[in-house]
């Protein structure tokens, strides 16, 4: 008798739990924008059910004392390829960096921290210029 009462008491709980398991999960959310100059122009958006990752691309080109940044962020079904960072210097006093990141949790394609993004590039460039000037003066 005790078993019957225990079974009857736990049955509604099991049915309620089974109902929760069938509720659809929310889609991934990512920041989304295309070739903008500021992360504030990248609003968050819900991805389609097929999208599994967030992608972030940042192109930074430094010309002497100015910096040009282009950001693109979006949802995607998979990563196009691994995370990468490509640097090049097409001319003296011109430096470029392309950074691509792929991640799979909500709003993970945020803006880069100052250590990761354009300020690090500008700081590195200023340090190189400063050291060159110091060598020239000595």
UniProtKB/Swiss-Prot annotation:
Superkingdom: Eukaryota
InterPro entries registered for this protein in UniProt: LY6_UPA_recep-like (IPR016054), LY6H/LY6L_nAChR_modulators (IPR051445), Snake_toxin-like_sf (IPR045860)
Record domain UPAR/Ly6: where: 28-122
One Gene Ontology CC term in the entry: plasma membrane
Pro-piece positions: 118-138
Keywords of this entry: Cell membrane, Disulfide bond, Glycoprotein, GPI-anchor, Lipoprotein, Membrane, Signal
Subcellular location, record wording: Cell membrane
Membrane topology: Lipid-anchor; GPI-anchor
Signal peptide: 1-16
Disulfide bonds: 30-47, 103-108
SUPFAM superfamilies according to UniProt: Snake toxin-like
Chain positions carrying an annotated carbohydrate: 27
Residue positions of covalent lipid attachment, annotated as GPI-anchor amidated glycine: 117
Protein name: Lymphocyte antigen 6L
